[in-house]
Swiss-Prot record:
Mn(2+) binds at D156, E158, E239. It comes from Synechococcus sp. (strain CC9902). Pfam families: DXP_redisom_C, DXP_reductoisom, DXPR_C. Its cofactor is Mg(2+); Mn(2+). This is 1-deoxy-D-xylulose 5-phosphate reductoisomerase.
Length: 417
């Protein structure tokens, strides 16, 4: 039975991971959980899974969590009360918890960077759903992986698809995603994208896009932030950078293809020009399960793919004029160094401002581009962790100040990186 820690247990990835644990009680057990502010759901998870440790991102909420557990009927309380910790240090304790064999990193955004690094430094295998870890800090994370021997297993559908395709090659042992060096025999990656909430909209109509429009995904059930990223195609741009670090390909050999049906989750072209693809219904539990069970596969009762039911699969190239965030991500990835961290932080803050209805949907790429342009003179090619954290905070502050002024440019001197 594999012992797992779930970082971000009350979020989309976390709840689906725990559903899998429920489906396979003889295969997995939960030893640690971390959460944000959803204490009601966390209490239910503690009751059901009885972890050894629980960590809250906000340490101030620990007394309330303890009160909620103490208020339970004695018959509903966990057999043994878990150890409870809080704050950033508490998250890192959960990420490196001694009895955990695999850590599922479901914390959204750059907030997941330090806990993920803690898991890597502790030598834990990771089911990586927090793509921002590699995007913002790939130059920092990859050397740590080499030192610790941790294995990265991608928990998002696209990179899981690539990983699964590579398991069938003679070089499967090199596809463990722990070095960042080019994967032998791999010529090209094609990341498929649903096109998001606005795939059938004209570019001119995006001026009228609302938060409700942007958070209504046609195929996938995801959190609000990632659903907005899907609508702007920033999510796919971030995945391009992640694929660059995971599989070692140059950006010119990583492509995005709009595939509205979301049946093909990604494709790889090998050196002999053959193309391998992984197919399935759009269900995040499938790539998460593969992370948990790898290198084995577990039989499931889940819905099986019937291509005659699908009927047809269609593909088209994304329009860069409609999806400027995609182009910004490619540019940041090619610039390298601290630029992806700035781009990612600016996007996270811009999306947060959009969800609060302080800016319009089309303002998101404007503020991201402004932050990236302002950072160019201070770009660091080979950053350390402190450098990444510093530029991350600078970009967030710059976007907030820009939005508060209602300007389209980020004024003032850049914070030295």
């Amino acid at each position: 039975m594999k012992a797992i820690s779930v970082l971000g247990s009350t979020g989309s990835i976390g709840t689906q991971t725990l559903q899998i644990v429920d489906d396979f009680p003889d295969q997995f057990r939960v030893v640690a959980l971390t959460a944000g502010r959803n204490l009601a759901l966390l209490v239910e998870q503690i009751q059901r899974h009885q972890p050894e440790l629980v960590a809250l991102a906000d340490e101030a909420l620990l007394p309330e969590l303890k009160q909620r557990l103490e208020a339970l009927d004695p018959s509903d309380r966990p057999a043994q009360c878990p150890e409870m910790v809080g704050g950033p240090d508490g998250l890192e304790v959960a990420a490196s918890w001694g009895s955990a064999e695999l850590v599922v990193t479901g914390i959204v955004g750059c907030a997941g960077l330090l806990p993920t690094l803690a898991a890597v430094r502790a030598g834990k295998d990771l089911a990586l759903a927090n793509k921002e870890t590699l995007i913002a800090a790939g130059p920092v994370v990859l050397p740590e992986l080499k030192k610790s021997g941790s294995r990265l297993l991608p928990a998002d559908s696209e990179h899981s698809a690539i990983f699964q395709c590579l398991q069938g090659t003679p070089w499967a042992d090199t596809a463990r995603l722990s070095t960042g060096v080019p994967t032998p025999g791999l010529r090209r990656i094609q990341l498929t994208a649903s096109g998001g909430a606005f795939r059938d909209w004209n570019a001119a109509d995006l001026e009228k896009a609302t938060v409700a429009d942007a958070t209504s995904h046609p195929n996938w059930s995801m959190g609000r932030k990632i659903t907005v990223d899907s609508a702007s195609l920033m999510n796919k741009g971030l995945e391009v950078i992640e694929a660059h670090y995971l599989f070692g390909l140059d950006y010119d050999h990583i492509e995005i293809v709009i595939h509205p049906q979301s049946i093909i989750h990604s494709m790889v072209e090998m050196a002999d020009s053959s193309v391998l693809a992984q197919l399935g219904w759009p269900d995040m539990k499938l790539p998460i399960l593969y992370c948990l069970s790898w290198p084995s596969r577990l039989e499931t009762p889940w819905r099986r793919l019937d291509l005659t039911e699908v009927g047809q699969l269609s593909f088209r190239a994304p329009d860069p004029n409609k999806y400027p965030c995609m182009e910004l991500a490619y540019a940041a990835g090619r610039a390298g160094g601290t630029m992806p961290a700035v781009m990612n932080a600016a996007n996270e803050e811009a999306v947060a401002q959009f969800l609060e209805e302080r800016i319009h949907f089309l303002d998101i790429p404007e503020v991201i581009e402004a932050a990236c342009e302002r950072h160019k003179p201070d770009l660091m090619a080979h950053p350390q962790l402190d450098d990444v954290l510093e530029v991350d905070q600078w970009a967030r502050t710059a976007v907030r100040e820009q939005v508060s002024r209602g300007t389209t440019r980020i004024p003032g001197p850049a914070v030295a990186a």
